[in-house]
Curated annotation (Swiss-Prot):
This is Polyamine oxidase 6. InterPro entries: Amino_oxidase, FAD/NAD-bd_sf, Flavin_amine_oxidase, Flavin_monoamine_oxidase. The keyword Calcium does not apply. Flavoenzyme involved in polyamine back-conversion. Catalyzes the oxidation of the secondary amino group of polyamines, such as spermine and spermidine. It comes from Oryza sativa subsp. japonica (Rice). SUPFAM superfamilies: FAD-linked reductases, C-terminal domain, FAD/NAD(P)-binding domain. It is an enzyme of class 1 (oxidoreductase). Residues 1-27 form the signal peptide. Binds 1 FAD per subunit. It holds the Pfam family Amino_oxidase. Coiled coil: none annotated. FAD binds at residues 61, 69, 261, 454. The gene is PAO6.
Length: 496
């Protein structure tokens, strides 16, 4: 046999072995792990699993992109964030793990949000409210919130004494319905609903006051306004273990887009995942990073049905809706300058187009305002035409600025996270009456089915850093089973 022939055979064999290597490593012709969802939790989990030496991972994503609820969209000539927007919890003793990626690694444009001058930016029908009066009401609200922190610290760890934030407010202010004047409702909405996307009457006091995100990482928040999008954080993480093309886009056979998972079957020997296009995938384990809203819907069927304790944990928690409505105008009519970025509308109808933000720094000359609504207002607005929403907004801004020549808005962008079957909401909120033990049941695996997502982060649910850390934590649980045969999972957080 000639040397060229020998070399050719060697190259063919080497190529064949290289192509088979992932299957040989796994011991089967199937991937070790399937990850459902390519948001930051799924991508973070995949990265940690890969770092542990389990390279044979397959990611199935329902949409045509990665990033999940971190998603930029073009509007008024700029890219705006219709989902996650802030790095929340910065400049504290501990470092928020997302902040170095945003600020140092990727150097995304971000701006510290200044809420300190809010008292001078509260509007009613007819113009500005009296600043001294608003400040007095805000000071009182801060006193009540501080009393809530003190009360929260005394509650039994089991959660048996937990109460809603509204109940705490009643105790401290002796008001049967909580804050009820337009200014008090506006301040209350900004304090709680703007953070949790649900009202104080349903939100757990013990598990949200004070918020670990801010006690751990600091009180500052930074608004990401970069044309690459906040989602570039997810692309950065994915690029550390998935291949990319020359343009930097993820182009790896281990990531399959437009794969809508509809069924997950599991047994003691493996899992089978079926998608809407009739594709079938098998693996040793599956990591489900779908949102809490999706788990509460009928999009994914589990066979056999998940045990009752798991189903109860899923349905006990709230999937909140947080809607950021962007509005484009032909000219500016609102105040700008230091201390003017955020302003409130004190309506007799709580949460009615209540929190506004102008973008003098973030998107100069774009003439865009952002108004945020939540909960029932979000659901109502998602179900009506954008033209109706625009008309309602125009009525509000003309009431706030009666002395200005307010032109008609030229464009509007209304995200619809609640209506989207791949999300069914914006982020999770911790409701009254659910213990840490029950929360940990959300994360707990069922056989070879593992779960991750911001809703599985007991300490930081609802936040980007919570989703990122949850991916790592859930991956560690899977790795312990796959590599160390430590498959028994003890639900933590239970107290007597």
């Amino acid at each position: 046999m000639t040397k060229p022939t020998t070399m050719a055979i060697f190259l063919v064999l080497a190529l064949s072995i290289a192509q088979l290597l992932p299957s040989l490593v796994a011991g089967t012709g199937r991937p070790r792990v399937i990850i459902v969802g390519a948001g930051i939790s799924g991508i973070s989990a995949g990265k940690r699993i890969w770092e542990a030496g389990i390279a044979d991972v397959l990611i199935l994503e329902a949409t045509d992109r990665i990033g999940g609820r971190m998603h930029k969209q073009s509007f008024a000539g700029v890219n705006v964030e219709i989902g996650a927007n802030w790095v929340e919890g910065v400049n504290g003793e501990k470092k928020n793990p997302i902040w170095p990626i945003v600020n140092s690694t990727l150097k995304l444009r971000s701006f510290r949000s200044d809420f300190d001058s809010l008292a001078q930016n509260v509007y009613k029908d007819g113009g500005l409210c009296d600043e001294a009066y608003v400040q007095k009401r805000m000071d009182r609200a801060d006193e009540v919130d501080k009393s809530g922190e003190n009360l929260s610290a005394t509650l039994h760890p089991s959660g048996r004494d937990d109460m809603s934030i509204l109940s705490m407010q009643r105790l401290n202010d002796h008001l049967p319905n909580g804050p009820s004047s337009p200014v008090d409702m506006a301040v209350d909405y900004f304090t709680y609903d703007y953070e949790f996307a649900e009202p104080p009457r349903v939100t757990s006091l013990q598990n949200t006051v004070p918020l670990p995100t801010f006690t751990d990482f600091g009180d500052d928040t930074y608004f990401v306004a970069d044309q690459r999008g906040y989602e570039s954080v997810v692309h950065h993480l994915a690029g550390q273990y998935l291949n990319a093309d020359k343009s930097g886009n993820i182009a790896d056979a281990r990531l399959k887009l437009n794969k809508v998972v509809r069924e997950i079957s599991y047994s003691s020997t493996g899992v089978t995942v079926k998608t809407e296009d009739n594709s079938t995938y098998q693996a040793d384990y599956v990591m489900v990073s779908a949102s809490l809203g999706v788990l509460q819907s009928d999009l994914i069927q589990f066979k056999p049905q998940l045990p009752s304790w798991k189903i109860l944990a899923i349905y006990q928690f709230d999937m909140a809706v947080y809607t950021k409505i962007f509005v484009k105008f032909p000219k500016k009519f609102w105040p700008e300058g230091a201390g003017r970025e955020f302003f409130l509308y004190a309506s007799t109808r709580r949460g009615y187009y209540g929190v506004w933000q102008e973008f003098e720094k973030q998107y100069p000359d774009a003439n865009v305002l952002l108004v945020t609504v939540t909960d029932e207002e979000s659901r109502r607005i998602e179900q009506q035409p954008d033209s109706q929403t625009k008309a309602e907004i125009m009525e509000v801004v003309r009431c706030m600025f009666p002395d200005e020549d307010v032109p008609d808005a030229t464009d509007i962008l209304v995200p619809r996270w609640w209506s989207d079957r791949f999300f069914r909401g914006s982020f999770s909120n911790w409701p009254i009456g659910v213990s840490r033990y029950e929360y940990d049941q959300l994360r707990a695996p069922v056989g070879r089915v593992y779960f991750t997502g911001e809703h599985t982060s007991e300490r930081y649910n609802g936040y980007v850093h919570g989703a990122y850390l949850a991916g790592i934590d859930s991956a560690e649980i899977l790795i312990n089973c796959a590599q160390k045969k430590m498959c028994k999972y003890n639900v933590g957080g239970k107290h007597g």
